[in-house]
Amino acid sequence: MRGSSFPGFPSTVASHTLRIATRKSPLALWQAEYVASRLRAAHPDLRVELVGMTTRGDKLLDAPLAKVGGKGLFVKELEQGLLEGRADIAVHSMKDVPVEFPEGLHLAAILEREDPRDALVSHRYRSFAELPADARIGTSSLRRQCQIKCRLPGCSLYDLRGNVNTRLAKLDAGEFDAIVLASAGLKRLGFQERIAETLTPEQCLPAIGQGAIGVECRSTDTRTNALLVPLHHPPTAWCVLAERAMNRRLDGGCQVPIAGFAQLEGDTLSLRGLVGNPDGSGIIRAEAVGHPSTFEALGKRVAEHLLDQGADEILRRVYATP
């Protein structure tokens, strides 16, 4: 389908260059180029260019993300670029995107999800079950930390920052017995052979939106919104939006011990949610099912089940920790 086939904008697609705001990490650039390739395939006359930007999260590499605080650490500067007209769309990892958008911006497309699960990477151990009781494990996520500690209480957890290549290099240097990363990032960068074990949702429930790419743009930019229509994948969107509805009700960010994972099977959308103490001492779980069209209500329902079990107390303690 060529760009000129969409109503609401002129047929002179080639006269305009679509600018994509992206972070500069290898994974972010891969995702932005993937979106660019999808746009070129859908609209052969469209010119596309990447606009690299540095976010606050990219600069604060010495502090654990949980202590940096705030929402949108990896997206705010890209959103500012959209609002200032320096870019037309911004490409994000959905797990980094806050549940609320600045006025004038919205989520225009969610692409088909890659593997949403976490992956164990290790030279010496081929599975989580093989890890010694006192294993040294690297991960920057409170969500992963609470689930790992629950299953392996005697392990030592270390903060792991930087891009995928940097994290793998730290493992290769012998700093850890194992590290836990998102499977999607490893696969997208060609590191799938480094995966020792793909962790099931029962072992480690994924982050909200993990494995999905989102495209943000100005709400009033009718032309750009129309160009993005072929990239949108409704089944993925129903799952991710259910997860995000749960997170919104919990008032959670992407740096807190909250997990959410939705799956679509036929006309049934199921959602599992989790909130846990970072030390693994207590994990609250809830799940529910519904029709895909009720994704918002489904997310809220799972959140209410979690809150009824005391999730708000856990999150209050996490936010109060300096």
UniProtKB/Swiss-Prot annotation:
GO molecular function, one term: hydroxymethylbilane synthase activity
UniProt KW keywords: Porphyrin biosynthesis, Transferase
A single BP term in Gene Ontology: protoporphyrinogen IX biosynthetic process
Modified positions (S-(dipyrrolylmethanemethyl)cysteine) in chain numbering: C254
Any single GO CC term annotated in Swiss-Prot or TrEMBL for this entry: cytoplasm
Catalytic activity as recorded in UniProt: 4 porphobilinogen + H2O = hydroxymethylbilane + 4 NH4(+)
Signal sequence region: none
InterPro entries: HemC (IPR000860), Porphobilin_deaminase_cofac_BS (IPR022419), Porphobilin_deaminase_N (IPR022417), Porphobilinogen_deaminase_C (IPR022418), Porphobilinogen_deaminase_C_sf (IPR036803)
Family matches, as CDD domains: PBP2_EcHMBS_like
Cofactor note text: Binds 1 dipyrromethane group covalently.
KW Oxidoreductase (keyword) present: no
Pathway the protein contributes to: Porphyrin-containing compound metabolism; protoporphyrin-IX biosynthesis; coproporphyrinogen-III from 5-aminolevulinate: step 2/4
Pfam families, A to Z: Porphobil_deam, Porphobil_deamC
Role summary: Tetrapolymerization of the monopyrrole PBG into the hydroxymethylbilane pre-uroporphyrinogen in several discrete steps.
Xref: HAMAP family: Porphobil_deam
Family of the protein in this entry: Belongs to the HMBS family.
Name of the protein this chain belongs to: Porphobilinogen deaminase
Species whose genome carries this gene: Methylococcus capsulatus (strain ATCC 33009 / NCIMB 11132 / Bath)
